């Protein structure tokens, strides 16, 4: 068993989690993007959607977005793609993650704390929720070994649509909003807020609805 084998909402019972919903990022401002980056992304997004494969969306949309975010934040965070993340194989907390963001800028080795897990899906967001949540639990356990902050964020994205999640303790909170690629500045603003808040050790809580 591995991350990809976890379904949703079955992952809740399998890993002993509770689910909630909240407007996690209400009021987070859009990040100002350069005209050159916006123009380049306009063409790459069109190309990725025309090819319409998970690989194309990952290469032409998701990777450039995360790379530009790292540049805008001064390279203060690590960015890993397609890495094996084996934490506890006995519980299925192992496998490959599409993208991992870490608070450390070190790129030679994956170090705690892992802040964000990003999983790319070609078909629909819901199909990636179980896999993403399992990877978030693995990240939480990985961080705990070095006494790092317990809050982990996850993102499931098709490239054109983005869904954010937060894990704190045994509670997974799903953002009630979905963000679309036309709101790229807002998506990158949320990612920047997650990363900079993690750097300061503060993540603001939002009122939530338990499921």
Task: Map each language-model feature to its residues.
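A short, conserved, highly charged catalytic patch centered on acidic carboxylates
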Residues: 2-4, 11, 16-21, 25-151, ...
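Short, conserved secondary-structure transition motifs
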Residues: 156-163
